[in-house]
Amino acid sequence: MSDQRKEKKLNETNWIINFDKIEDSTRRNYFSVLPQENRLMEHFAEAFVINKPKGRVGGDGFWLHKHDDDVYLALFTCVGEGHLASMMIRIYMNALKKMVEGYSIDFPGSILQFLHREVQARFKDKNNILLNTNANVGIVKLNTSSKKMEFAGANMDLLQVINNEVKIVEGEKNQVGENTETRHSYSSNSLQDAENSSFYLCSSGVFNLIGGPDFKKLSMNQLGDYLLQNKELDLTSQKQLAEQYLTTWTGANRQNDDIMVIGFRA
């Protein structure tokens, strides 16, 4: 082998090693910034998290915060996937940290409004950036004493299983963080009979999964019907069944998006 070819081979090997180190570091950072599943269980009667990035890192994340008797839970799906979407997760997490440390904002709809303005302001003068700054977000507020619950969504809905019924609590159609002049507003919805319900927040990737008997995208109604069939089970068992259901639905097809599902009971 000539010296030039040896040098080229060495450079390629070094590039692969360095890239793998970056990948490993990004993966560690991605998972370290997210709360652990057991933290959810400290604040909800039952809870689970399914987090399956398409690649080594993902663009789905969640945030948990407790203030007095109120617990706040947010799931956000940053547009795109991989490293760039993972970077946006940190930006959204930092914006939420800034909010709780310096502002008295307690309604889920108001939190979405803050997030939208904060991300817009951060990227206002960066028209040529490669990042997609917008995200789908769902936020739940639970008062642990009264068991009252509120929800607000930015292009994200909430599944509620209650008695023998599946309800879809709709959020607004607008995302947060879009770099447009369109005026955004987000309302908070009070949830009925929260103490006797199971709730599920799902990233958009769940409903991008293609498969099933008709080789189509999974719908929220289909997932809701499956969860309803298993409503008597504890959420630990439901998590295992939900993972199996999503895998079976996809079948031999490749996972085409990041997936995150959070289930919880008040």
Regions found by a protein language model. Give the residues of each.
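Acidic beta-to-alpha connecting loop that harbors the catalytic carboxylate
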Residues: V79, G205-V206
